[in-house]
Design a protein with these regions (language model features):
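Structural recognition of the beta-strand scaffold that forms the well-ordered cores
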Residues: 44, 53-54, 71-74, 109-114, ...
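Stable alpha-helical elements in mature extracytoplasmic
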Residues: 55, 94, 160-164, 242-248, ...
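The catalytic-center signature of Zn2+-dependent metalloproteases
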Residues: 152-239
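Active-site-proximal segment of zinc-dependent metalloprotease catalytic domains
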Residues: 100-179
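Propeptide-to-catalytic entry region of secreted or membrane-anchored zinc metalloproteases
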Residues: 18-110, 115-118, 254-259
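Pan-zinc metallopeptidase signature
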Residues: 2, 236-260
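Fungal secretory targeting signals
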Residues: 1-20
């Protein structure tokens, strides 16, 4: 079973959510590449108490249900009081300062930051993809960021903790199921390599709600994978990773994170 570590950093709350995920694409090198986990947590300016072990249970339940080979153990957590870090702007000097100060462990160790995200449109979370030979800056920025209202007990319909599952999927090298072909005009997920996983049906664009029977790529096999954790549907609609996604996560974790 593959091993990694999670460090959860609790930093703030938000009251409105629009965007499901703000994870940015990885380098071309990672795109071309075809797990018991330990968890550490930090938190700042918490406005209410969350049962963070419940969230770790959510991760373990959903990763185990799909036989991914990953399991998460919370090994540390912190509550940080710092007004400058309550609202994090992605890809900002503020984010680098916060993560440089708080990040723990090795490149294989997942640091999870729970904080309000300042972005237009608002985001539920974002993550970093693994890189080959990561620089010190890339190592410092590595991890997953989610807002508190995406955790169990937050604001529906994204309040069952599956934003964290989705973003950890990115941290473990998974793309969106609707990953667009950059060489198409307009961009579409119906052509090109998609998410580089053979057993996820092609999907033209993100799905919202729970549109059963949606088929946005009618010339491709299968209906849209609306119940996959790497789509944008409601938490209650999401049920699984595929076997191919599990294989990709295990392979790239071992290749890019396991010994770093």
């Amino acid at each position: 079973m593959l091993l990694t570590a999670i460090i959860i950093l609790f930093l703030g709350f938000t009251t409105s959510v629009v965007g499901r995920c703000g994870t940015r694409p990885p380098s071309d090198t990672v795109r071309a590449l075809h797990v018991e986990a330990e968890v550490q947590e930090n938190a700042a300016n918490a406005q209410r108490t969350l049962d963070r072990p419940i969230f770790i249970s959510v991760l373990n339940t959903h990763f185990a249900n799909s036989n991914t080979g990953f399991r998460f153990n919370l090994i540390s957590q912190q509550t940080i009081q710092n007004d400058a870090w309550v609202n994090v702007v992605p890809s900002s000097a503020q984010e680098l300062e916060m993560k440089s100060a708080l990040r723990q462990g090795r490149y294989r160790d997942l640091n999870l930051y729970i904080v309000t995200i300042e972005n237009d449109p608002p985001l539920l979370g974002y993550a970093t993809f693994p890189e080959q030979n990561p620089s010190q800056t890339i190592r410092s920025l590595d991890g997953v960021v989610i807002i508190p209202n995406s955790l169990p007990g937050g604001v529906a319909p994204y309040n069952l903790g599956l934003t964290g599952v989705h973003e950890v999927g990115h941290w473990l090298s998974l793309f969106h199921t609707f990953e667009p072909n950059p060489n198409s005009e307009p961009e579409t997920g119906c052509t090109g390599p998609g998410d580089y996983v053979i057993d996820t049906p092609a999907e033209d664009s993100p799905a919202y709600g729970c549109p059963v029977g949606r088929d946005s790529c009618p010339t491709q096999r299968g209906l849209d994978p609306i119940t996959n954790y790497m789509d944008y549907t409601d938490d209650a609609c999401m049920t699984h990773f595929t076997l191919g996604q599990g294989l990709r996560m295990r392979t790239l974790f071992a290749t890019l994170r396991s010994f770093v």
